[in-house]
């Protein structure tokens, strides 16, 4: 357990950057849970060095300092971190009570973390205006009191770092139209969903809400091009993101929803995932299994090509592990839902 007998020692330190979607995901989660925490803005290595704490490998934001074997250790990766916090802080749960719905939440959280991030990285560096904006603001998110010459130096470094990462998310001239259309479709579905329900899976946020929220903080609050798109077609989404930043005051009611209670908009979202997130996750896993450095696939609306990404292959394996944990009747219920929305290959591929 993360909790100790001393309240003071249960104030968790975490490092990140305001322009990091996963940092924003975890801050909003901790606020909703009312878990005491301190946010440290700054370069991870610079912050950890005086503490004699080794940085995680690789360094992914945010970085939490958590007790491991009697000493503080730098820990990263938001999804298992949320699970660890949920086990220690069961009040105000972000996992649905219903087992089938909890699995759907797990898939949607991964969709937010692994597909919606493609929107974010694509828009941040694909267009000149967005790349210039990111190059200027990313270093200022770490330290604002720097000279113009220092800013120019850091701007070049940050811009290069962002562009070098595009291969991971598959952003290129060939895939750009598909990413743009997928982002707009996602916004339209979420906009329609928010007309009838305040959160993705009920009356209070689940972990999948925070995953989607994290990416959207950047898409509508940092990068010019996707922000303009969102303001044109999804005003409810904009309001939703702004309010989810701090839901510590939301009084949580018992959530007794089941899979059959999900509105049509969630089915629509999974159908959208079936032509984007699902086939690319499976193609990437196949490439990793075959030892291929890159892969391509024909999607309904165009060709997708990118370098193989080992971490996302692990994500698909974890989804299957979660599915195998389900009771037989719940497994059948989930499979029917996935099959209805053309996503069953998430749990059947490579069987």
Which positions does each model-derived feature cover?
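Single conserved hydrophobic/aromatic residue that forms the stacking wall/gate
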Residues: 1-8, 12
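Short glycine-biased active-site loop of nucleotidyltransferases that positions the nucleotide triphosphate
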Residues: 3, 49-58
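C-terminal non-catalytic accessory extensions
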Residues: 305-351
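GST superfamily/GST-like fold recognition
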Residues: 200-220
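Active-site/pore-lining binding-face segments in mid-to-C-terminal subdomains
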Residues: 213-304
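Internal, well-ordered alpha/beta segment that forms a basic, Gly-enriched binding/recognition surface
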Residues: 57-59, 67-181
């Amino acid at each position: 357990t993360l909790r100790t007998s001393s309240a003071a020692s249960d104030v968790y330190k975490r490092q990140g950057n305001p322009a990091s979607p996963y940092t924003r995901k975890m801050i909003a989660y901790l606020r909703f849970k009312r878990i005491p925490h301190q946010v440290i803005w700054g370069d991870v290595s610079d912050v950890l060095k005086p503490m004699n704490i080794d940085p995680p490998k690789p360094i992914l934001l945010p970085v939490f300092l958590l007790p491991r074997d009697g000493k503080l250790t730098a820990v990263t990766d938001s999804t298992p971190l949320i699970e660890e916090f949920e086990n220690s802080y069961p009040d105000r749960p972000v996992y649905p009570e219903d087992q089938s719905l909890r699995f759907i939440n797990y898939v949607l959280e991964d969709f937010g973390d692994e597909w919606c991030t493609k929107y974010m990285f694509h828009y941040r560096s694909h267009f000149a205006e967005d790349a210039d904006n990111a190059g200027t603001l990313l270093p200022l998110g770490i330290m604002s009191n720097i000279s113009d010459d220092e800013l120019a130096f850091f701007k070049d470094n940050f811009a290069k770092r962002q562009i070098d990462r595009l291969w991971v998310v598959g952003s290129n001239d060939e895939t750009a139209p598909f990413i743009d259309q997928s982002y707009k479709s996602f916004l339209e579905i979420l906009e329609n969903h928010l007309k009838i329900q305040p959160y993705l899976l009920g009356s209070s946020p689940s972990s999948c809400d925070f995953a989607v929220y994290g990416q959207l903080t950047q898409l509508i609050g940092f990068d010019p091009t996707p922000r303009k798109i969102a303001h044109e077609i999804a005003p409810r989404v904009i309001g939703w993101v702004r309010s989810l930043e701090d839901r510590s005051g939301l009084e949580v009611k018992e959530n007794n929803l089941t899979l059959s209670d999900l509105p049509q908009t969630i089915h629509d979202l999974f159908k959208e995932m079936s032509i984007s997130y699902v086939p690319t996750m499976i193609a990437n896993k196949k490439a990793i299994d075959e030892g291929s450095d890159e892969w391509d696939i024909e999607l309904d609306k165009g060709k997708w090509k990118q370098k193989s990404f080992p971490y996302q292959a692990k994500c698909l394996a974890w989804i299957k592990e979660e599915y195998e944990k389900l009771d037989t009747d719940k497994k059948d219920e989930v499979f029917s839902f996935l099959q209805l929305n053309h996503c069953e290959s998430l749990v059947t591929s490579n069987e």
